[in-house]
UniProtKB/Swiss-Prot annotation:
Active-site residues, Swiss-Prot/TrEMBL: 127, 223
Gene3D superfamilies, per database record: Adenine nucleotide alpha hydrolases-like domains, HUPs, Translation factors
Annotated protein name in UniProt: tRNA-specific 2-thiouridylase MnmA
Keywords noted in UniProt: ATP-binding, Cytoplasm, Disulfide bond, Nucleotide-binding, RNA-binding, Transferase, tRNA processing, tRNA-binding
Annotated compartments: Cytoplasm
List of residues binding ATP: 36-43, 62, 151
Reactions performed catalytically: S-sulfanyl-L-cysteinyl-[protein] + uridine(34) in tRNA + AH2 + ATP = 2-thiouridine(34) in tRNA + L-cysteinyl-[protein] + A + AMP + diphosphate + H(+)
Organism of derivation: Chromobacterium violaceum (strain ATCC 12472 / DSM 30191 / JCM 1249 / CCUG 213 / NBRC 12614 / NCIMB 9131 / NCTC 9757 / MK)
C-alpha cells in the first residue's frame, strides 16, 4: 500500500503478525466487532448498521493481492480509499492489514494447481474459508473482538449450541454457496448483518447514511483478476499448450490455445462457427482429454454429453458438527443456479455422490457442489 494511503488520519497499515493493537475492553455491554471492509456498499452498510446499534466497531481492509497493484485493472487502492471514506463517515477506526502472503500460500497456489490440471476452481470459496474466516478471524481475535462481521448475504441461526448457516432472505443475492466450507468454530465467531435485508434496501440505507459507496458497482469475477482479461492473467503464471478441438468421435474441428483457458459448457471464445458439420448449432465445451491435450466440443446446448444425472465430490466440508445422513436434499453445482433436488449417497473414504432428479447441465470438475436442507447450508465438496 502506498504512502498516500498509509498517511490517512485514523488509519493504520500493518503486516499480519506485526503491530497488533492492544485495545482496552469497553465498559459497556456492547460487543467489539471487527468488520471486513472491502470498499463496497455491502461492507459499508454492515459497519454502519453495527455502529448504529451501539457496538464498538473496528474496520479492517484486507489487502490480499499485491503483485500488480499499479496496473490498470487493479482497484485495490481505490477500494481502500473508499473504505477509509466510509470509516470516516461512520466514525470508526480502520486498519489496512496485509494478508497477501497467506492468500498466495493458501488460495492462489491452489488456484494455479487446479487450472494446470485442467479443472476450474472457485478461489472465492477457499478465500472465505482460509482468509476471511481464518487469517482475518485470527487477527480480529487478537484485537479482542467478540466476533467478526462481513457484508455477505447469508444468515446464521444458533440453536442449542449449534450454529446453522442459512440462505439470505434475498435469495437472488444469497452467498451461502461461497461460505459452505465454514465450520462451527468459524460460524460461532461470525455475524452477517445483511442476511435479513434485500440488496435494494442496502443501497437505500447507504444513500440515507451518506456513504460514498451507495452507488458503487458490485465487484464481479475472481477477486485478484478483477476486470482484466482472464487469459492474459493466466498466461503470466502458467505455460500455454495449444492442441486440437475434436468432436466426441475424434473429428478435428479447430485448435485450442490451452486446456486451462476453457471450462465445461463454455460457448464464447471457441472461434469455430456453427456450420462445421452442417447443422448450424453453436459449439460448447463438453470435456477435456488431458493426456491427449484435446478439447472435446459438441453442438447444441442440450447435447447428451452436457447433461449428467450424477456427480461425485471429494474434499468434503460440513457446516454442522456431523456429516449429513444419506437421503433427499437439494444442491447447487455452481453459483446462481436454482436448487436441484438430489439424493446424497453414503460417504465413503471422504467421498460422496449426488444423484439428481433432473440431469444437470455442464457439471464442472473443480467447482463446488453445495448441499442444502431447505434454507440450511449443510456443506459440500469439490466436483471430481
Amino acid at each position: 500500500m502506498d504512502e498516500g494511503i498509509r498517511a490517512s488520519g485514523g488509519i493504520r497499515a500493518c503486516q499480519t503478525g506485526k503491530q497488533k493493537q492492544g485495545r482496552k475492553r469497553p465498559v459497556t455491554g456492547k460487543k467489539r466487532i471487527v468488520v471486513g471492509m472491502s470498499g463496497g456498499v455491502d461492507s459499508s452498510v454492515t459497519a454502519w448498521l453495527l455502529k448504529q446499534q451501539g457496538h464498538e466497531v473496528i474496520g479492517v481492509f484486507m489487502q490480499n493481492w499485491e503483485d500488480d497493484n499499479d496496473d490498470e485493472y487493479c482497484s485495490i487502492k481505490q477500494d481502500a480509499l473508499d473504505a477509509m471514506s466510509v470509516a470516516d463517515i461512520v466514525g470508526i477506526d480502520m486498519e489496512i492489514v496485509n494478508f497477501a502472503k497467506e492468500y498466495k500460500d493458501r488460495v492462489f497456489s491452489y488456484f494455479l494447481k487446479e487450472y494446470s490440471a485442467g479443472r476450474t476452481p472457485n478461489p472465492d470459496v477457499l478465500c472465505n474459508a482460509e482468509i476471511k474466516f481464518k487469517a482475518f478471524l485470527d487477527y480480529a481475535m487478537e484485537l479482542g473482538a467478540d466476533c467478526i462481521a462481513t457484508g455477505h448475504y447469508a444468515r446464521k441461526l444458533e440453536q442449542d449450541g449449534t450454529h446453522y448457516l442459512m440462505k439470505a432472505v434475498d435469495h437472488t443475492k444469497d452467498q451461502s454457496y461461497f461460505l459452505y466450507r465454514l465450520q462451527q468454530h468459524q460460524l460461532a465467531k461470525a455475524i452477517f448483518p445483511l442476511g435479513d435485508i434485500r440488496k435494494t434496501e442496502v443501497r437505500r440505507l447507504a444513500e440515507e447514511a451518506g456513504l460514498p459507496t451507495a452507488a458503487k458497482k458490485d465487484s464481479t469475477g475472481i477477486c485478484f483478476i478483477g476486470e482484466r482479461p482472464f487469459r492474459e492473467f493466466l498466461q503470466r503464471y502458467l505455460p500455454t499448450s495449444p492442441g486440437q478441438m475434436v468432436t466426441p468421435d475424434g473429428k478435428v474441428v479447430g485448435e485450442h490455445i490451452g486446456l486451462m483457458y476453457y471450462t465445461l459448457g463454455q460457448r464464447k471464445g471457441l472461434t469455430i462457427g456453427g456450420s462445421r458439420d452442417g447443422n448450424g448449432e453453436p459449439w460448447f465445451v463438453a470435456g477435456k482429454d488431458i493426456p491427449g491435450n484435446k478439447l472435446i466440443v459438441v453442438q447444441g446446448h442440450d447435447h447428451p454429453l452436457l447433461l449428467k444425472p450424477t456427480l461425485s465430490m471429494a474434499d468434503l466440508s460440513w457446516t454442522l458438527p456431523d456429516a449429513p445422513a444419506p437421503g433427499e436434499y437439494s444442491a447447487k453445482n455452481r453459483y446462481r443456479m436454482a436448487d436441484a433436488a438430489c439424493t446424497l449417497s453414503p460417504i465413503v473414504d471422504g467421498q460422496a455422490s449426488l444423484t439428481f432428479q433432473e440431469k444437470q447441465w455442464a457439471v464442472t470438475p473443480g467447482q463446488s457442489a453445495v448441499l442444502y436442507h431447505g434454507d440450511i447450508c449443510l456443506g459440500g465438496g469439490i466436483i471430481q
